[in-house]
Design a protein with these regions (language model features):
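Extreme N-terminal, non-catalytic leader segments
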Residues: 1-43, 87
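NTP-binding/hydrolysis catalytic cores, primarily Walker-type P-loop NTPases
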Residues: 1-3, 229-232, 238-255
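Helical mechanochemical/support elements of P-loop NTPase systems and associated helical scaffolds
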Residues: 29-32, 51, 55, 73-74, ...
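Residue-level signature of catalytic and energy-coupling elements of molecular machines
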Residues: 33, 44, 78, 107, ...
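Walker A/P-loop phosphate-binding motif and the immediately C-terminal alpha-helix
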Residues: 35-73, 197
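Phosphate-binding loop that captures ATP/GTP phosphates
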Residues: 65-67, 71-119, 225
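Switch II (G3) loop of P-loop NTPases
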Residues: 110-169
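Conserved catalytic-core segment of NTP-binding enzymes
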Residues: 146-238, 244
């Protein structure tokens, strides 16, 4: 990955050529991936990564080849949810994803960071708001274009809150991915997720459905049904506070 000074030096960067080459590499790496699904919410605290990891495991238990890309670069949680006790730690030189629980392949910035260490890029602090986004987008391109994903039936993209990462991935992939939306029942979650779903639809993503998480507890509301009616899609799963493997198997059967 290039540094800030390499990106900003006009004689050395070749940024346009680099991005073009990476896009070509992404297309080549993902040529054997049958389906790409972005798991998103537009809101934090809804259990999106938890849903992504358990959905991936259920799909893998059903005999499918599954990969997960943890697109939450600043708050990666997928390694903690999928890491097998015997899994190796990723290295900068490796081009293979880690193999996690139930054989799910995954890649995450969390594999490269020391425990508790924040993500940081080298560059001038005073200008970080200008170049940090470009560096994060470059990291995503490398995760997709440099990792040997192999033959996958489904690649799940675990997105952070907000829409910036979704937009970056649309640009990197060339086509908008199918979207699976996660919400909790509350009106506040509904309103935040609505904005994310509307943006995804406007960008051209197919809506796979809505997962309503943390159902049946203290959280009250009808966010799942409200959003399903508004966007003419389905609530494909209602996840209770203590789901069983059958809960995830039923969700996986709908993909």
């Amino acid at each position: 990955m290039r540094t800030y000074h390499q990106l900003t030096d006009p004689d050395r960067s070749g940024l346009g050529d680099q991005i073009g080459a990476q896009r070509k590499r992404v297309a080549e790496r993902l040529a054997a991936v049958r389906r790409i699904v972005a798991v998103m919410s537009g809101k934090g605290g809804v259990g999106k990564s938890y849903v992504t990891a358990h959905l991936a495991r259920a799909l893998a238990r059903g005999g499918r080849s599954i990969g997960v890309l943890d697109a939450d670069l600043n708050g990666p949680t997928i390694p903690g949810l999928l890491r097998d006790s015997d899994a190796r730690r990723a290295t900068q030189e490796s081009s293979e994803p880690a193999s996690g629980l139930d054989g799910v392949k995954y890649i995450s910035m969390g594999q490269f960071l020391e425990e508790g260490s924040p993500l940081s890029f080298k560059g001038p602090t005073a200008e970080s708001f200008v170049w940090r986004g470009a560096m994060e987008a470059a990291a995503l391109r490398e995760f997709l274009g440099d990792v040997e994903w192999g033959d996958l039936e489904v690649l799940l993209l675990d997105l952070p809150p907000g829409m910036q990462r979704y937009i970056e991935l649309c640009d990197i992939l060339g086509n908008p991915p199918t979207v699976l939306t996660v919400t909790i029942p509350t009106p506040e979650s509904r309103d935040a997720v609505r904005r994310a779903m509307r943006a995804a639809v406007e960008r051209g993503s197919e809506l796979l459905g809505i997962v309503e998480n943390m159902v049946g507890g203290e959280l009250k509301g009808t966010a799942g049904d409200d959003l399903a009616a508004e966007f003419a899609t389905a609530v494909v799963a209602r996840i209770p506070s203590h789901p069983t493997p059958d809960t995830w198997n039923r969700l996986a059967a709908q993909l």
